[in-house]
Regions:
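Active-site and adjacent substrate-binding regions of carbohydrate-active enzymes
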Residues: 1-213, 220-244
């Protein structure tokens, strides 16, 4: 990366979720299964014509919140935790994060918008009425309120953390497939941050060599980390250490 340049990280935008980058990385049957799953979750797929004349998906048309509705077994009870895990993972990556409005509000598929416009991308371009959005944000137990409060808390913590500077080093840590973990830093002062994510719907043992020693602080809880041995489904941690390492 040239000096003065940075990655721009985001999961969703006003367009669809691109799937062409998966080509060559995932088997075609896995891509096909993903497309079918998004159909089951109320979304669509925009298609292109390949050189051989066959149709192939180039983007998924679905809100990111509804894309997190379940896994290959179908919808489940983990939609909001899964969604928040995906955002905390993105926010921890080296670079500058961007969050689309309808990610910040946990917006559902706008199927009426698709019918009105005749465009698949309208599914993720809902036009909020102010009173409707304010009601969702102010009413306890709505997904919109939970998502908005959780994401703004993450953003506040991230903004004040030196290890999240766009130029801070990043290293992906060795973990089982059920976990994704990375280290940001160390900074010039020796401060390090470990971001670890359980990307499954089952509790997972948390056994990272990098966390075995030293005192760690839970950035979001604003409290010392208690060295929990198990990470709950779709739970994420941002842990910081002041010492060198």
């Amino acid at each position: 990366m040239p000096p003065g340049c940075s990655f721009l990280n985001f999961t969703a935008s006003h367009d669809g979720i691109g799937v062409r980058p998966l080509e060559g990385w995932l088997p075609q049957h896995d891509i096909d299964a993903l497309v079918e799953l998004m159909h089951r979750f109320g979304g669509y797929a925009s298609m292109r014509t390949r050189d051989d004349g066959e149709d192939a998906p180039y983007e998924l048309n679905i809100t990111w919140f509804d894309a997190m509705k379940g896994n290959r077994r179908g919808p489940d009870a983990w939609q909001t935790p899964r969604f928040l895990c995906s955002q905390q993972l993105m926010l921890g990556l080296r670079g500058i994060p961007a969050i689309y409005l309808h990610v910040l509000t946990g917006t559902l598929n706008d199927l009426e918008g698709v019918e009105r416009s005749g465009r698949l991308r309208s599914i993720n371009r809902r036009r909020w009425q102010r009173n409707e959005l304010e009601w969702l944000l102010e009413t306890p137990a709505t997904p919109t309120r939970e998502v908005f409060k959780s994401l703004t808390r993450m953003l506040d913590a991230r903004r004040q953390e030196p290890c999240f500077h766009p130029d801070a080093p990043q290293r992906v840590l060795d973990t089982p497939p059920s976990l994704i973990a990375l280290q940001r830093g160390p900074t010039a002062e020796g401060r390090r941050l470990i971001a670890v994510h359980n990307v499954t719907d089952r509790p997972q043992p948390l056994e990272l060599q990098e966390l075995a020693h030293g005192q760690w602080h839970d950035l979001l809880a604003q409290a010392p980390w208690n060295h929990e041995a198990t990470l709950a489904p779709y739970r994420s941690l941002w842990l910081v250490s002041e010492g060198s390492g």
